[in-house]
């Protein structure tokens, strides 16, 4: 006899926290909890594209993402995992 599973509503997705982040060769690299490393290009994000390498290297880790205070840009880890790297021109 099969029993119906109970639908308790939408499942919450908790993106892993960033442990460290750096800028290298026109890409942002992020090491996440669990050891995964993400790399994504700065192209397509006007704020990051117009920033100097020094500004791009000043990344603040936030519980849910990355912040570049010099260029007032914030990207969430959840968005990065979806392929959303910020504002598009």
Q: Model regions: which residues?
A:
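Motif-centric detector for short Cys/His coordination patterns
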Residues: 1-89
């Amino acid at each position: 006899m099969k029993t119906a599973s109970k639908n308790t509503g939408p499942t919450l997705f908790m993106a892993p926290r960033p442990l460290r982040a750096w800028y290298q060769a026109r890409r942002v690299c992020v090491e996440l909890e669990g050891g995964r490393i993400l790399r994504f290009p700065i192209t397509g994000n006007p704020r990051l594209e117009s920033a100097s390498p020094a500004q791009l290297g000043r990344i603040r880790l936030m519980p849910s993402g990355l912040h570049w205070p010099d260029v007032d840009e914030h990207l969430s880890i959840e968005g990065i995992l979806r392929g959303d790297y910020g504002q598009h021109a």
